[in-house]
Structure formats: structure tokens, C-alpha cells
């Protein structure tokens, strides 16, 4: 190794920092194999030196027990090595190609390690080993009273590491520690690994550099009346006498149930502890704390030595001095951290009293560190829960000696082994766990673009063809064995016999039924609740919705209220960005009743969609619900139910189906599964809507084609979703009472031009949507209709012209103004409509993400016709 220069000044520390930085730069290029070889060699060397290092520490500091320090050194070498020997800390440490995620470990750089006088060699071993495992350089600032042993431990690790291939200057230390050099080191390092008292920890956190610091412990041990007294007392003795109580997690007080207090005292005495009488307790009080601070002369000393200092005579082999005290506030010297075999003993009148005492002891002197409970873990689980809920400590140990238990991997093998125990924000720390290698690594996450898992959801059964309704209903008896059917429809359909084909078939099969026919357009919550009263009394095992969108929406809501009367519509109507990641989980449907939808108009597609809209009649608020639990279990598309639809309904619902298809095709969430349905529906609507509108029941073929087109469009948008045509249409209809099909048809032209912009203000956000291509998608629709055109823009305009021709042919007017909406009324609602349209659930899947001002502009163009 190169000639060593004593670090005793700012100048020499500056040089050392530079050398360690250069060494770390080289070390950061090492492979995992090289690092693991160095890590093992260093751990072996530290383990082999455990006895001489322990002797040196006790000799130098005059504190602790050699044999226990041997165990600590052994632990720091063996347990730390065992914990991390197979951990990846170099380069790629995790990779999942299916999710496109790769995690890469990088060292943080230079670690400033502040070492306490209480555990000098073991802490130095621990910190140098985890620094080597993570390819960091480390510079140690030892405590002045333990510098010789601390440096020897670091030197032992360094020599073994270099021999195994590590850079020569990867570990260094301050030979002549001072406050000035320690502060300089902390300010110059990349991270501070601090172990010590509150003052040192505060200094570390004030350095301006990231710090991993711990602080004082004041561990209370509560002994519940259900505890195994022999186990509890001997565990506490084992912990408190370990290295003469210098582990920061060691018990500082015991709080004992009054029901077993004498028994616990007897066990302590039996095992060699000394219960101080009141006079002796007072003498020891004055020895523990001097001038408001812990007396350094008692730290790590034997109980007999401390008793002598206090002028108390005890047997030489006394293990612990126990003072019976009552106060838990700071005026009581025994209530402080003592770092010696001196213990406070409190009597508790109840478990809650014990909790309060323990809480106060932690609050005043050991926030965040460790607390301990002895209890019957089988019968007193509630007490354990109360204890960990009350204690503000990051380690809550149960039936465990806290010194050995707190450092981890000895009494619980999932608690990380460490000699630096985080105290969380309660203790003013940045970590709340046992510090380990992960805290000395920067983890880069490489995230490759991945596309969402998509889906195609539809009712489990969809039946179609004219006259299929009674045939499909036979399944209720022959397949499902249903007994009671509740029918939901509107007054017009009921009075005009639309439900008769269903009720006749149910009567034929001997199935009991009841009909609710008070559904109005834009169904209300009151309407749904009225229906649910009947449903609750009737208790159906099947619900059949017959009608257009309103009847099916109302029936879906009744279905929800019947199966889950506890639901909150505000929660169910909550907006989502991804239906699979929504905050609100929709309740499971279909457990009480099977749901069948029978459409009587060709437009909404509700028979195959997971959507419903309900209005709160008291506020006028519409609640749009969307969840695949609302998907009907069966859809029966029988064109015979649509033959006599009036022209206005045929027109509005037909254009609604067209908009469903177009929006589903250009949606960011469109897939090959929805594209085919959308295109087929578009072609069918252009061909057959005029015939259905003009000929009605005289052209049953056109009626059937439109029925199928509406359902295909429904399947398409049930999976690809919609866009701002529907966002704007919903609000226009709500504010100005126009039919839904009319409103979406009115805004369609301007929305298409808006979406087709190749340089949008903002494009939509979805991984499958790689770049703005709505124009291309509109052109593909035009191509499917053989509209011609040489460019995509030309094809778009031809498609819009074709749509306008269709709308005119089926009786549509051209502008909002043409429908009798006054300019004053329209403009007075414009801002509110625009904002609410922006917040509509349909906006999220639109290929162009709109600004509210852009929605407003589209509304204005649609009102006046063209440019504004």
C-alpha cells in the first residue's frame, strides 16, 4: 500500500477526500463478482480480528465487556455478510422485460461515517462492510475516546479489501478527530452515516448533505399480567447487561402490572439484580444525571462500579441496579436513557396506565427508537395492537430482549441486521428502519414504453334476428330455472303493447312477473327508488329492461340499488382515467338477479354497454355511471320491437349510433376488435338509416340492419369508449333540453375537424396512442365508404359532407340556433357547459386533449354555423 499520511488537519483531510474520491471512481466500475469477493474477504478479516478489536475497545474506552464486544464484532462481520452476500448491488439488479422495467444500482459516492464511543469497532466494521458492498468510498470520523480501536477496525477491513482487489484508498479515517474536521467531512461527503447522540445527529442533518442519522433510545419494557414472568425478566437482564447496557436499544425502564409486580421483583432479585431502597435510589439518582446530562462515568460500567460511585453497597456480582420510581417525566433521573445496567421500575394499575407511562418515557427521551412488550401473544392480540398503535417507535419488540432484538436477525429473522437503527421522523431521522445497503445506493429506474393491456367485454349472450325475443326468453325456464321476473319499461311502450310479447311468454312458461312502467326520459333517482321499492317487495331473480336508453338506464340503476342498497352515487360516478384503476371499486352485480336488456330503438346501444346515467331530481345533477359490472348479462336484439318507431326517434337514435361508431373508431383506446364493429356499423348506418327513416315498418330489412348496427356500435364504444362529441352533447342536452342524438349530431362536424388537426395543442395520453392520427382514421372511414379523395384532408371533408347529407336526409337542422335556442340563453350557459364538458367522462378517450377554451369555440361554431 502507498505511504500513509496522518489526517489531522484541514489540509490532510482535503487530500484524503480527493484520494478516496478517486478510489471510489475506480471502484464504481467493479463488477458484482469483484465486489462480492472483496466483501467476503473484508468480513472474514473483521471476524478473525473480533477478539483483539474487542480488547482494544474496552481498554481504550474503559467501557463495556470484552466478551460482549467480541459478540458485537462477530455479529457485525458475520450477520451483515450473511444478509447481503447474495444481494445485487452493481449494475442491473432487477429486470422485467414484460413490464419494460430495469433497475440499476449506483453507489452514492463518499460516505462520511461518524462512529460512537459506545460501539466503536463493531460500528466501524458494519459501516465499512456495507460501503464496500455498495461500491462506495468511506471516511470514518471516530470518537476521540475510541479513535485507536475504531481506526484499527477500519484498517483491518481496508487491508483485507485491498488484498482482495479493492482500490487502496477506498477506506480512510481521521486520525486526530475534532469538531472542525468532522464538520468538514460531513459537508464534503455525498452522504452521512451517523450513529450517536442527538447533538451529533442534529449536526449531521444540519450539514447540508443527505444524512442517515439515529439518536437516543429510551426503551420502555411493559410487562403485562399475561406475560411469562421468567421469560420477561431474564430477557431483560440478558439485554440490559449486554456490554453493560451500551446498546442504544437496551431497556431503560420496566413497567409492570400491579398484579404481577411482586413476582417480577422476586425474579429480578433471584437472578442477581439489586432492588434499591428509597435512600439508595436517591443516591443513584444523583449519580445518573449531573447538571441535566447523563453522567459519562456510568456509561458502560458494571452495576457494582456505578453503585460505588453513588455510595451504595451492593454485591460485586450484581447484574442490574433497579430503582422503583413513580414519575415518568424528565424531573425523574431514572426516566432518562442511562446506557448502563441501571433500570427504572414502574408499577402500572392497568394496561392503559402502562401504555401512558411508556408513551411518556418515549415522548421525553426516545422518540422513534424502540419499545418492548412482554405479553401472551396467543390470548392478548388486542393488547399487542393497542401497544404498537400507541408507541411512536420504529421498532416494537414483543417478548424479545431489546438490545439483541433491536439490531435484527437474532430474535426475528425478518428484521434487518444493523448497528445503525433509524428512528424515523419522530426521532428527527430520514429513515425509520434498520439501516442497510439500500440506503447507500442510488437506484436508477429505466422504464421502457409499454402499451396497456386492453380488453373486449360484451354481454355473455347476445341474441339477434327478427322474432328472436320469445325464443331467447325460453332460456329463463329451460336453462336458468328463473322463477320471478321484474320488467322495467316506460309508459308509452307499456300502453302500446311492447311488453306483451314478453309477458305472454313468461305466462306460457309459468314464470311470475311484475312490470314497472313509470320510467320517463332522463330517468331520475326518485324514479329508480320507486321501482326498487317494488323490486324489494317482489324479490325477482331476473330483471328485464325493455325500451330505449332511458328505460335501460333506469333498470340498471334499480338493479344496483336492489343488489347493493348501500351504494353512494357520488362514489360510483367518480371520474376515472383507466377503468381498471379507478379509485372506487364497483360492487359485484348479478348475485340476486340476472339482467336482460331488450332495445326498442336502434341507437343507444345500452343493451351491450356498461354505462348508465341517472339524474338527481332535487339538484338536476346527472350521474354518469361506468363499470363493466353494469353490463347486461343478456341482450336480445329483435327488430320486431323497433318497427313502429317514429321518425324523430329513428333519426336521433340513428345519428347517435353513427357518432358512437365514429368516436369509437378514432378513440385512443380503439383496437382491432372494436375497429371492425365500428366500420361495419358506419357502413350499415349510411346505407340503411335513410330507408328506416323514410319507410319505417314498410322496410323491415332496414329496421333490422339498423338494430344490428346500433348494437355493433354499442359493443365498439363499450370497449373503445367515446370522445368529446358525447362530452359536449351530454351538456348541450342537459342545459338546453335537446334530444341526445340531436346534440351529438350537431357538434360532430366541428369535433371531427378539431380532432383531425395534425398539430394539436395537446394530444391525448395513452400508451397505444403514439402520435396524432385522427385525420388518418377519419380518412380510413371515408375509404370504407368509397368517397374518394387524394389526401387525408380531402377525404375528411368528403366524409363530413357525406355525414351532413345523411343528417339533412333524416331531418336534422344545421345549427344549435336552428333548434330555437336563443343566443342569450346559449351564451349565458356557454362557460359552464364548456367546463363541464371538459370534465365529462368521455373526454378522456378523445384523440385530442381539449382545452376548455377550445370546447367553447366548438360550441360557438356549432351554434352559429362554421367560423366565428
Summary of predicted features, one role per range:
Residues 7-9, 125, 201-329:
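ALDH superfamily catalytic-core signature
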Residues 738, 742-825, 868:
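Gly/Pro-rich interdomain helix-loop hinge
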Amino acid at each position: 500500500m502507498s505511504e500513509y499520511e496522518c489526517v489531522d488537519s484541514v489540509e490532510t483531510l482535503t487530500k484524503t477526500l480527493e484520494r478516496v474520491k478517486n478510489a471510489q471512481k475506480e471502484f464504481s466500475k467493479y463488477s458484482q463478482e469483484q465486489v462480492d469477493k472483496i466483501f467476503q474477504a473484508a468480513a472474514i478479516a473483521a471476524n478473525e480480528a473480533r477478539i483483539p478489536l474487542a480488547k482494544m475497545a474496552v481498554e481504550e474506552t474503559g467501557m463495556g465487556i470484552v466478551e460482549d464486544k467480541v459478540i458485537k464484532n462477530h455479529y457485525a462481520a458475520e450477520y451483515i455478510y450473511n444478509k447481503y452476500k447474495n444481494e445485487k448491488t452493481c449494475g442491473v439488479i432487477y429486470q422485467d422485460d414484460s413490464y419494460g422495467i430495469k433497475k440499476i444500482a449506483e453507489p452514492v459516492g463518499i460516505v462520511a461515517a461518524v462512529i460512537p464511543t459506545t460501539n466503536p469497532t463493531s460500528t466501524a466494521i458494519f459501516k465499512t462492510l456495507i460501503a464496500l458492498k455498495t461500491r462506495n468510498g468511506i471516511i470514518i470520523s471516530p470518537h476521540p475516546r475510541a479513535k485507536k480501536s475504531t481506526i484499527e477496525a477500519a484498517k483491518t477491513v481496508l487491508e483485507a479489501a485491498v488484498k482482495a482487489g479493492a482500490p487502496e484508498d477506498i477506506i480512510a479515517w481521521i486520525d486526530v478527530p475534532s469538531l472542525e474536521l468532522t464538520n468538514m467531512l460531513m459537508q464534503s461527503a455525498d452522504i452521512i452515516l451517523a450513529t450517536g447522540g442527538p447533538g451529533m445527529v442534529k449536526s449531521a442533518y444540519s450539514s447540508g448533505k443527505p444524512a442517515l442519522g439515529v439518536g437516543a433510545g429510551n426503551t420502555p419494557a411493559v410487562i403485562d399480567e399475561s406475560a411469562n414472568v421468567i421469560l420477561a425478566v431474564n430477557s431483560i437482564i440478558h439485554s440490559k447487561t449486554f456490554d453493560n447496557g451500551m446498546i442504544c436499544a437496551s431497556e431503560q425502564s420496566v413497567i409492570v402490572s400491579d398484579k404481577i409486580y411482586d413476582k417480577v421483583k422476586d425474579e429480578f432479585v433471584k437472578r442477581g439484580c439489586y432492588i434499591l431502597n428509597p435512600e439508595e435510589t436517591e443516591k443513584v439518582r444523583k449519580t445518573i444525571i449531573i447538571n441535566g446530562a447523563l453522567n459519562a462515568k456510568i456509561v458502560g460500567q458494571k452495576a457494582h462500579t456505578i453503585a460505588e460511585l453513588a455510595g451504595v453497597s451492593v454485591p460485586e456480582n450484581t447484574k442490574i441496579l433497579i430503582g422503583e420510581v413513580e414519575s415518568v417525566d424528565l424531573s425523574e433521573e431514572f426516566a432518562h436513557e442511562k446506557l448502563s445496567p441501571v433500570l427504572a421500575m414502574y408499577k402500572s394499575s392497568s394496561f392503559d396506565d402502562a401504555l401512558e407511562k411508556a408513551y411518556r418515557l418515549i415522548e421525553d427521551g426516545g422518540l422513534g427508537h424502540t419499545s418492548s412488550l412482554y405479553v401472551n401473544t396467543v390470548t392478548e392480540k388486542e393488547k399487542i395492537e393497542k401497544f404498537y398503535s400507541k408507541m411512536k417507535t420504529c421498532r416494537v419488540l414483543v417478548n424479545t430482549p431489546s438490545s439483541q432484538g433491536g439490531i435484527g436477525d437474532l430474535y426475528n429473522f425478518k428484521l434487518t441486521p444493523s448497528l445503525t437503527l433509524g428512528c424515523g421522523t419522530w426521532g428527527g431521522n430520514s429513515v425509520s428502519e434498520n439501516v442497510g445497503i439500500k440506503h447507500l445506493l442510488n437506484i436508477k429506474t429505466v422504464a421502457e414504453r409499454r402499451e396497456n393491456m386492453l380488453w373486449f367485454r360484451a354481454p355473455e349472450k347476445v341474441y339477434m334476428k327478427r322474432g328472436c325475443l320469445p325464443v331467447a326468453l325460453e332460456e329463463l325456464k329451460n336453462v336458468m330455472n328463473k322463477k320471478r321476473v321484474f320488467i322495467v319499461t316506460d309508459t308509452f311502450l307499456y300502453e302500446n303493447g311492447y311488453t306483451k310479447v314478453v309477458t305472454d311468454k313468461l305466462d306460457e312458461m309459468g314464470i311470475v312477473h311484475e312490470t314497472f312502467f313509470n320510467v320517463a326520459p332522463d330517468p331520475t333517482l326518485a324514479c329508480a327508488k320507486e321501482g326498487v321499492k317494488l323490486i324489494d317487495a317482489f324479490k325477482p331473480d331476473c330483471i328485464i329492461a325493455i325500451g330505449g336508453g332511458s328505460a335501460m338506464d333506469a333498470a340498471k340503476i334499480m338493479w344496483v340499488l336492489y343488489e347493493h342498497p348501500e351504494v353512494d352515487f357520488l362514489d360510483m360516478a367518480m371520474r376515472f382515467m383507466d377503468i381498471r384503476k379507478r379509485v372506487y371499486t364497483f360492487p359485484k352485480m348479478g348475485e340476486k338477479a340476472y339482467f336482460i336488456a331488450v332495445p326498442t330503438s336502434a341507437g343507444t346501444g345500452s343493451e351491450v354497454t356498461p354505462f348508465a346515467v341517472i339524474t338527481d331530481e332535487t339538484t338536476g345533477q346527472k350521474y354518469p355511471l361506468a363499470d363493466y359490472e353494469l353490463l347486461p348479462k343478456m341482450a336480445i336484439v329483435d327488430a320486431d320491437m323497433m318497427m313502429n318507431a317514429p321518425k324523430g326517434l329513428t333519426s336521433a337514435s340513428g345519428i347517435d349510433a353513427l357518432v358512437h361508431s365514429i368516436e369509437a373508431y378514432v378513440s385512443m383506446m380503439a383496437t382491432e376488435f372494436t375497429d371492425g364493429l365500428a366500420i361495419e356499423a358506419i357502413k350499415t348506418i349510411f346505407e340503411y338509416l335513410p330507408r328506416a327513416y323514410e319507410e319505417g315498418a314498410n322496410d323491415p330489412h332496414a329496421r333490422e340492419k339498423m338494430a344490428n348496427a346500433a348494437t355493433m356500435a354499442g359493443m365498439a364504444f363499450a370497449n373503445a369508449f367515446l370522445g368529446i362529441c358525447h362530452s359536449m352533447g351530454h351538456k348541450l342536452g342537459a342545459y338546453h333540453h335537446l334530444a341526445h342524438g340531436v346534440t351529438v349530431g350537431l357538434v360532430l362536424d366541428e369535433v371531427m375537424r378539431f380532432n383531425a388537426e395534425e398539430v394539436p395543442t395537446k394530444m391525448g395520453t395513452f400508451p397505444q396512442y403514439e402520435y396524432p392520427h385522427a385525420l388518418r382514421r377519419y380518412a380510413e372511414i371515408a375509404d370504407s365508404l368509397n368517397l374518394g379523395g387524394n389526401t387525408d384532408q380531402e377525404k375528411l371533408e368528403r366524409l363530413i359532407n357525406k355525414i351532413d347529407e345523411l343528417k339533412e336526409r333524416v331531418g336534422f337542422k344545421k345549427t344549435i340556433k336552428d333548434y330555437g335556442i336563443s343566443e342569450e340563453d346559449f351564451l349565458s350557459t356557454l362557460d359552464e357547459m364548456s367546463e363541464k364538458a371538459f370534465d365529462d367522462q368521455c373526454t378522456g378517450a378523445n384523440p385530442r386533449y381539449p382545452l376548455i377554451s377550445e370546447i367553447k369555440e366548438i360550441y360557438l361554431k356549432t351554434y352559429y354555423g362554421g367560423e366565428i
